[in-house]
UniProtKB/Swiss-Prot annotation:
Its main location: nucleus. It comes from the Eukaryota. The gene is xlf1. It is found in: Nucleus. Belongs to the XRCC4-XLF family. XLF subfamily. CDD domains: HD_XLF_N (cd22285). Pfam families: XLF, XLF_CC. Coiled coil: none annotated. This is Xrcc4-like factor 1. Disruption phenotype: Spores sensitive to ionizing radiation. It comes from Schizosaccharomyces pombe (strain 972 / ATCC 24843). GO terms for cellular component: DNA ligase IV complex; nucleus. Keywords: DNA damage, DNA repair, Nucleus. GO terms for biological process: double-strand break repair; double-strand break repair via classical nonhomologous end joining; double-strand break repair via nonhomologous end joining.
Amino acid sequence: MSWVQLRGHRFHFIQASFDAESNEAVQVIHITDLVRVWSCTCSRNQIVNQAESERCPIDPFQTFETLVDVLAEVLVNVSSESRIQLRGSNDEGSLKIFCTSKIAKDIFLEWNWTLWLTPPETIAKMVWFPLINHHLFESETDTSPGSLMSIIRDQKSLLNDKTWFKEALNERSSSSNPSTPRKRSAFADIISPKRPRTRYDFV
């Protein structure tokens, strides 16, 4: 499984697998902000119970495989038109995904997942080590659009292009006014702040 950018969320990436034939791990979902990882595993019974309680328009008994396929489509497919929202808990111990998708005329599918924060070492095991391995041993052309590696390469290309630096430098030069007298800098105030004169009254 590869990490792909979560649709509509610039700094969050998702890794997910869906297997309608499994009973215990039909859905395995991970989300990262590149600092932490949240995860959840959903069994067949959990999905069926949630579909019943939320009055899902797709029958979880007769068309369970279809339901799983649709959930995978709306959550992972970068070209899907579904809307995804993230909501974190106050203690950041859990993360909720809310997904809304139009599956037919005037028929909408609404679904949510609750992911739980994993131990700190998970970020290295699931994100950084695979990225290093990919960089060292795999072809640079072997990346799909929207994947974490492709986004990193795009940003690297942007940094290597010096045009942005020259434009920023020219903009800063044009905005400065050489006739303006230099003032005491904030940094100078920090290291040697101005002090008011102390008056001494002698008796």
